[in-house]
A protein has these predicted regions:
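Short glycine-/acidic-enriched loop or helix-start segments at secondary-structure transitions
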Residues: 15-16, 47-48, 81, 122-124, ...
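N-terminal subdomain of nucleotide-sugar transferases
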Residues: 1-63
Length: 147
């Protein structure tokens, strides 16, 4: 089985409960699942030097080849809520395109989507509808001020 992840954040970013995702990914790899991740270049909780380093890393492989991570360019996360909303929207647009048309994504059997930012679920539902693959929506860390 091959699992597609369309994530707003991915290591080395500082996001809520990073060990939960890392443990899940390790368990999936240990169970023999292949994973494909599309995520923006890191921005949250890292130095500018690390961000610059990752601008050159468009593809990484983890878990002895079981996980392929593809990163795409996107503006850095800011404190301004309008810019943050713009960033999330642009990320979802890019992930919809990647999840629908990218070669590695087209080989996936199922999608696993986190619930933050809240518009991730809507984007994933569109990918599911177009691709006709199952979707696991991991609902957590939703607070009223997020909506």
């Amino acid at each position: 089985m091959k699992i597609l992840f369309l994530t707003a954040y991915f290591s080395p970013e500082q996001a809520a409960s990073p060990y939960l995702g890392e443990n899940r990914n390790q368990a999936f790899a240990d169970a023999g699942f292949d994973m494909v991740v599309y995520s923006p270049i890191p921005t949250r909780g890292i130095t500018n030097e690390i961000r610059q380093e990752y601008k050159k890393k468009k593809h990484e492989v983890f878990f002895d080849g079981k996980m392929n991570v593809y990163r795409f360019n996107l503006i850095g996360e800011k404190k301004n809520p309008v810019l943050r909303a713009w960033r999330y929207t642009m990320s979802c647009v890019k992930q919809f395109v990647k999840g629908t048309f990218a070669k590695d994504a087209r080989l996936c059997d199922i999608m696993f989507i986190a619930s933050t930012p809240p518009i991730q679920g809507a984007m994933a539902a569109l990918v599911k509808k177009v691709r006709r693959i199952p979707l696991v929506y991991n609902l957590q860390d939703i607070f009223p001020d997020s909506l």
